[in-house]
Amino acid sequence: TIQYFFSEVIAMFKNLGLQLYSIRDYMKDPEMADFAFERVAKMGYTEAQTAGNAFDAELFGKLLTKHGIKIVGTHYDYGEIINNPEKTMEIHRMWGTTNVGIGGMPGEARGSLANLNEFIDKFNKVSEIYAKNGFKLTYHNHNFEFVRIDAFKTLMDVMYEKFNPDTISFVLDTCWVAAGGADVCAWIEKLAGRIDILHLKDITVVNENGRITPRMTEIGNGNLEWNRILKTAEETGVKHYVVEQDGFFLDGNNPFASLKASADYLKPFIK
């Protein structure tokens, strides 16, 4: 039984997306991917954000199209984005998306403010190449971006201030914002007009031998206020709503029961 912890459910968006990292174990070859795409399409997922592709990119895209799923963005290799923009744009054109993304910054970029600024400068510079060709770079956060990089500002604050808003958008992840101790709706409002893709991921806490531990979970099974989050997202111009669950599935290592639970919870919000 799905429970809604508010009095009224209001339809907010037209299409439900899936970050394919959620089904990464099924992305290893065309047969497994075909099977997985068919299953999630039947659950109501009509959009996807990629997380790499282990086989031919053209076939990968065709399999998604076969099941009525449109690619709306990617998490792509950072080195390829920086060093091989022409090939990267060619693949994204073939996939039919203008959102070229990374799942996070290189590890060394978090080490110091100087390193962070170097990463931002490089990402800003290459984003201009993509923008001239009709693309936009995207950045997906985790919780470490909410660590204070100096006495006053978090990494997220610095990126908010220094990323070029005309050429780079944020893929804001609801779970990781909350796990970073920040206010999800406040960040959606702060980034108004700069979030094309919102990652829908719930968070709960579990008791592990007396230790209270945060854990991602199915939409509606955690502690986030989805009515408020989705209303704020709609009001601020979010274009794509993409479910992601990295792990901790209802059925062991099988993600499908969890993805169906999230899709079922979100169906009343779909126009």
Residue ranges of each PLM-predicted region?
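Short beta-strand and adjacent tight-turn residues that come in two discontinuous sequence segments
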Residues: 50, 74, 102, 243
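Histidine-acidic metal/acid-base catalytic patches
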Residues: 3-42, 54, 65, 93-96, ...
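Active-site acidic/histidine proton-transfer and metal-coordination neighborhood
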Residues: 38-42, 47, 58, 70, ...
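The substrate-binding groove and active-site-proximal loops of carbohydrate-active enzymes
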Residues: 75-77, 106-113, 175, 216-220
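Glycine-rich, proline-tolerant flexible connector loops at the mouths of alpha/beta enzymes
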Residues: 45-65
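Residue-level recognition of beta-strand->loop/alpha-helix junctions
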Residues: 22, 49-52, 75, 141
